[in-house]
Amino acid sequence: MSDTKGAAEQGLQIDGDLINSNWNEVVDNFDDMKLKGELLRGIYAYGFERPSAIQQRAIMPIVTGRDCIAQAQSGTGKTATFSVSILQRIDTTVKKTQALVLAPTRELAQQIQKVVIALGDYLNVDCHACVGGTAVREDIARLNEGPHIVVGTPGRVFDMINRGALKTEAVMMFCLDEADEMLSTGFKESIYEIFQLLPGETQVVLLSATMAPEVLDVTKKFMRDPIRILVKKDELTLEGIRQFYINVEKEEWKLETLCDLYETVTITQAVIFCSTRRKVDWLTQQLHDRQFTVSAMHGDMKQEEREVIMKEFRSGSSRVLITTDLLARGIDVQQVSLVINYDLPSSKENYIHRIGRGGRFGRKGVAINFVSNEDKNMLEEIETYYNTQVEEMPLNVADLI
């Protein structure tokens, strides 16, 4: 893989033809995957009818115990891919932690926990979310009960292993979700330390939207002959998402543009992304002053506060959420029909994580980008990177949402 790494170190998005998929077997329905009956019931009760492309390819090899690297965009069913595989592999009669899943944010870890519990509803599965912002004593007590599956953020998980609360001797599966995000946000050391503390034969499953150099390093150091299921760059589509831009010229005109849009469009649910926490607070205040109902969420807020806001947003009692990139990957709300990039993301990779929120699993969505004169270059870069066309917003945008 050395030439791949060279390309990666030059800061290039790695082309699909440099690291080819080495697994092409497709199983296109859940009934043919030889899954436990209770797990199948959970899958259908959750609302899945047939597996997504990544599920059709990855579940079977993961269930057989192979190490696996899966590259797929946000919103393609990655969480269910490893959740189903873990639930199939673990033995729920054994009261020990058998699978460990890491995620970059608390919100994503809690989201994964919810999916695991829902899919494992008929299996009596015990799944614990081990995240910062919660009482250490409670965490230790829960981990001493030996939950079958632990989902957590790297810092807290490492701490719990060190304290002897999270016992790893029975761990047979280690899964890294959104690996690119975790490794780029300073968790690398904790993740490497955790690897050293797991049994040598632990199966490793890694999921990532992009194959950054840090991700490739992990695959080389810790994975044995992995199956690679890779979506080529030009296949990282934004399928089903209608993308538009509004030319606002000046930064200070964005607010009025947003207010106009708010009045034209009936929004079921929308997420508005800003570049900084301060901007989130400012915009929320501006909209409140104009009698618009919106909620806001960012990393400076207390954990309990963030949970209340997410609950309101999920239940639909709050319809518009203003947030930052940090939380883009933890928002999984089925009804999100509109994403507004008040500020374009500072990195091209984050674009897919933001607008992948709308239209998940084939549901249609609309993304509207506010573009000032300074943003034009970034928009062009995004179009080139994703091989996509962002059109000027039509007057009848209300009919499309």
UniProtKB/Swiss-Prot annotation:
Known CDD domains for this protein? DEADc_EIF4AII_EIF4AI_DDX2 (cd18046), SF2_C_DEAD (cd18787)
Q: Which residues form the Helicase C-terminal domain?
A: 240-401
UniProt keyword annotation of Transport present:
no
One Gene Ontology term from the biological process aspect of the record: cytoplasmic translational initiation
> What keywords appear on the UniProt entry?
ATP-binding, Cytoplasm, Helicase, Hydrolase, Initiation factor, Nucleotide-binding, Protein biosynthesis, RNA-binding
Q: What is its subcellular localisation?
A: Cytoplasm
* Helicase ATP-binding domain location: 59-229
- Enumerate the residues binding ATP: A72, Q73, S74, G75, T76, G77, K78, T79
Q: What is its EC number?
A: 3.6.4.13
Q: How does it assemble?
A: Component of the eIF4F complex, which composition varies with external and internal environmental conditions. It is composed of at least eIF4A, eIF4E and eIF4G.
Q: Which family does it belong to?
A: Belongs to the DEAD box helicase family. eIF4A subfamily.
UniProt note: domains: The Q motif is unique to and characteristic of the DEAD box family of RNA helicases and controls ATP binding and hydrolysis.
Q: What is this protein called?
A: ATP-dependent RNA helicase eIF4A
Q: Which organism does this record belong to?
A: Cryptococcus neoformans var. neoformans serotype D (strain JEC21 / ATCC MYA-565) (Filobasidiella neoformans)
Source organism lineage?
Eukaryota, Fungi, Dikarya, Basidiomycota, Agaricomycotina
The gene it comes from is TIF1
